[in-house]
A protein has these predicted regions:
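Cytosolic regulatory regions built on CNB/CRP/Popeye-like sensor folds
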Residues: 1-139
Length: 139
């Protein structure tokens, strides 16, 4: 199994994938490289992609009213972010900035929907995991 495929299977929404489903999903994803200090997306940008970190670290933050940054999280390999935008495209609620050079896998809504249609058993698990994550943030 490739490192990227292993990272996909460890991402919270995709833990139930078997090797074949993980390989199929990985084939639907795009590789993204970002250099230290670069902004992947900014708070308020439109979004419809989730990202899984393969290598490196990113930080998620928001801007306060007085212009200061509120750090939400530092994320590393195997962690995922942006998943809500797959089902509710709209403005991003935070800014994602590379803390180190990083390699990511990106999955857009336009590729996820057909993949789920081909893997309906995974779709139910995905919805259950998404509901779990939402309950953790009290939405």
């Amino acid at each position: 199994m490739s490192t990227e495929q292993d990272v996909v299977r460890k991402a919270p929404l995709f833990t139930a994938l078997d090797e074949a489903a993980a390989a199929s999903l990985r084939a639907s994803m795009d590789s993204v490289k970002i250099v230290k200090g670069s902004v992947l997306f900014a708070e308020g940008d439109e979004g419809d992609h989730l990202y899984v970190i393969v290598e490196g670290k990113l930080k998620l933050g928001t801007s306060s009213g007085d212009g200061r940054e509120n750090l939400l999280s530092i994320l590393g390999p195997g962690e995922m972010f942006g998943e809500l935008s797959l089902f509710d495209p709209g403005p991003r609620t935070s800014t994602a900035t590379a803390v180190t050079d990083a390699k990511l896998l990106s999955l857009g809504q336009e590729k996820l929907i057909p993949w789920l249609a081909e893997n309906p058993d995974v779709a139910l698990h995905l919805l259950a995991r998404l509901a779990q994550r939402l309950s953790l943030i009290h939405i």
